[in-house]
């Protein structure tokens, strides 16, 4: 089984959406892969559950999230050695955070370009994220 880790800043919006989307698509397309998600700076956020715009978009896509009520998780609190691929949602935002985290220095990390709110509306960023996740699932199929 292939394991993917999606990473964003607070683990409440982009990475959680990507995780739920990926797992749903893999299940419906019978792809032997699974995803989880974590954040690089979860302590900066008071709201620590999945962000409402992500839940709304998942509902629109008829995806029932499996972890919507779970708190966000910091990347240093999980064993990232079990993942075959680590994807940070926005290279411009996350590369400096990764570079400053000694825990992550030895890992090959891929960077996407899914920009966070308020710079980019969720109505733009989440469909873009869905497309990137769909492309990834197709590559694994």
What are these regions (language model features)?
Residues 80:
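A conserved, positively charged/aromatic
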Residues 40, 91, 114:
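Active-site loop/turn elements of alpha/beta-hydrolase fold enzymes
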Residues 1-77:
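Conserved active-site segments centered on acidic
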Residues 22, 30, 51-53, 93, ...:
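Generic alpha-helical propensity signal that fires on short helical segments
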Residues 12, 91-94:
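Short glycine-rich anion-binding loops that position phosphate/pyrophosphate groups of nucleotides
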Residues 94-141:
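Phosphate-binding/catalytic loops
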Residues 83:
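An anion/phosphate-binding loop that grips the pyrophosphate of nucleotide cofactors and donors
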